[in-house]
């Protein structure tokens, strides 16, 4: 009968257990791929003390118990050791065909993970407290609440893949960010009727910004996304039927420059009606066009709105223009305008028609929203004044019905 192996304290070691010359305990096992794997600890059991100068750790037999539980539960004991960066790369590899801006966003997040200590951690070691600490570090590094929330959502999706693949049991990113960070997101600006009138009047009269008057007016009267607006070409305008055909958007990337993309969703492909003000504004835009050399981008040319270099304008151009316009207005007027972006004009358009009682499905179509919830809950901003006006309108209708009856 073979003699039982013992450690340096005379304790019998079980099958697979051994002790190295430096005193560290070792457990050897064979993984699902037939490859030998090893687990180490300075302690055999939980009550042991670690040698002087060594960091405290989980005992070998506690680690063996966790390992055996993982194997019993079908957990991939190799897969759970992949790093967070590797897991995120695995998720992205499962959906390789994405838009360029999505690809750019993925790269940004991967770069963040590579620089953060969480990125090199094995996914089985990441706890909810670790994920929350990551969110706090992101905030301390200047990232906005909404940006952190978007990145958290991506990592949460990555861990769902790990759960489905039996690499981990729980999702450490399954928590509400607002329980960790204050939501400092600035409410989206919706212009009042008075603010809208003042903005247009100032732009029309100002020597610097009068050239942008029709652009602002069209954005307010069509509700187009700025990428759709910037991508408009002459063939997209149907003056006979008074509509704008939307089937593409123009974007610009710092690395690849200008490029054309299809709309964000299938619902983005639509025909937006031209109200009279938009119709006349488009007519003025065409009348004022110069016979400059036309650029071509991904097969599209005859862009309507060009910068000084005869390249089509994009979001950054309009953001800068609106910022300068509002700054100049506020310099000379006591009744200040709020921070306004091109997207503020889209919000204003949607809110105006929602408050006017437009059929929600019709408004959803015009806005190009993928689902009705976005139209109702995300863009349509109700105010006390609009709520009061709506109540008065309904009460007036009821009174008229009674008189007729």
Curated annotation (Swiss-Prot):
Database matches in Gene3D superfamilies: 1.10.150.130, Classic Zinc Finger (3.30.160.60), Intergrase catalytic core (1.10.443.10)
PROSITE patterns to which the protein is assigned, alphabetical: CB, TYR_RECOMBINASE
InterPro entries hit by this protein: CB (IPR044068), DNA-bd_dom_sf (IPR016177), DNA_brk_join_enz (IPR011010), Integrase-like_cat_sf (IPR013762), Integrase_catalytic (IPR002104), Integrase_recombinase_N (IPR010998), Integrase_Tn916-type_DNA-bd_N (IPR004191), Tyrosine_recombinase_XerCD (IPR050090)
Catalytic residue positions: 225, 264, 343, 346, 369, 379 (o-(3'-phospho-dna)-tyrosine intermediate)
Keywords from the UniProt entry: DNA integration, DNA recombination, DNA-binding, Transposable element, Viral genome integration, Virus entry into host cell
GO biological process: DNA recombination; establishment of integrated proviral latency; symbiont entry into host cell; viral genome integration into host DNA
Xref: CDD domains: INT_ICEBs1_C_like
UniProt GO MF annotations: DNA binding; integrase activity
Pfam family, one: Phage_integrase
Keyword Phosphoprotein: no
Residue span, Core-binding (CB) domain: 79-163
Keyword hit for Phosphoprotein: no
SUPFAM superfamilies named in the record: DNA breaking-rejoining enzymes, DNA-binding domain
Domain Tyr recombinase positions: 186-392
Family listed: Belongs to the 'phage' integrase family.
Name recorded for this polypeptide: Transposase from transposon Tn916
Organism: Enterococcus faecalis
